[in-house]
Structures are given as C-alpha cells and as structure tokens.
Amino acid sequence: MIEIKNLSKKFGSHFSLQDINLCLEKDESVIIMGQNGAGKTTLIRSVLGEQIPTFGSVRIAGIDPFKDRSGALSHVGFVPQLPPPIKLSAKELIRYAVVSSGIEEARIVSICEELELDIKEHFKKLFFKLSGGMKQKLLISIAIAKEPDILIFDEPAANLDAKGRESFYKLLQPLQKKRLLIFVSHRMEEIKSLLTRKIEMDLGKAVNDEKLG
C-alpha cells in the first residue's frame, strides 16, 4: 500500500528525515510515535506529496505522489491534527466532498451521527466557526465515507472529549481488516486494541519498528 525507500528530507543543513525505509500494508493498523521534532509530521507530509524529498521515494499503491498526487491521494483519506480554516459552510464542505470524491451525503451525515454530531443542525454554519470537536468529527466522517484504502489520522482525538474518542475508536473497529490505518498519536493506550504495529521516530529516524498483538 505505502512503500517508502531511503527517504530523507533536508531543510538547510538539518535533516528532518534520515533514510526512512518502511513498507505499510493493507490490514495493518500502525501508530507512529515520537517527541515533537522527531520527524512524524514531515514523514506524513512527504507521504501525502506535500513535501518533495531530498533523497528517496514514496509510492502509494504503486503511484508516486510527487508525479501524480491526485492519483495517489485517491487511495487516501487524511484527517489533520489542526483542521484548516475552510471558509465554506458545513453543508458546502459536504457537497464539495460529494462531488469531488463521489460519496453520498447521507453516508457522511450517518457517520457524523455515529460520532454523536447532528451535522444537519449546523449545515449553515461556516466550518471554521464550528467548535474544534465538531470540525474534527466532520473531517473524520468525510475521510471514512470516502472509503479509501488508506486512512491517516494525525492526532485525530486531540479535539474530542472522552465520549467522542470512545465513539471514534468504536467506529474504526470494523475498518481494521479492510484498510491500512495510520495514526500519528501520543494516545497509544486508548487505541492499543486496534493496533498491529508501532513505529517510533527520533531525530528524523525510525528507531523502532515492532509488531503488536
């Protein structure tokens, strides 16, 4: 699903990533951990084709995201840690997702409800004016409704309360055996039952890669 070979990213004289080699497969649930500055965000941005590597390569389902980003990202659903300041209403954002990804509005609304968000009550509100938890739940719902092969969550529960996190993790359980799930998170204990693999990063390197369960 995702193949990373000899990936390095240099900013000035500093290597944010150093010789990363990873192969992430379908049916895996992977957590990527590390202190701030360990290289986690740079790794995800490189996988998503947002940052061109200094050395090495990335393939998503065999596609180079730096040459065919739209093709590569058609396999990916991504939920960022900090929701972007989108200046669309909640309804308009959902319509955009429906048109661009061919998903059904009813499916997005249904997933929102599973996360205990009645998004219809907030259709007219601008996305950036929703609460942090509402934004996160809506983005999670859109990503899952897309039914991609790969789901990447960057601290997905950061803006969710305990009940919201519980609903989110429950929602992921049936997806475990169907997709590649990647979590960038410090909350390993909360999602331990979902995980099959742990990757630890430090100073731009993958210093530990182990199977779980």
What are these regions (language model features)?
Residues 48:
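Helix-to-loop junction immediately C-terminal to a conserved catalytic motif
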Residues 88-102:
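Q-loop/switch helix immediately C-terminal to the Walker
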Residues 56-67, 71-72:
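Conserved ABC transporter NBD signature motif
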Residues 33-35:
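The feature captures the beta-strand-to-loop junction immediately N-terminal to the Walker
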Residues 151-155:
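Catalytic Walker B motif of ABC-type/P-loop ATPase nucleotide-binding domains
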Residues 2, 17-19:
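Conserved structural motif at the start of ABC-family nucleotide-binding domains
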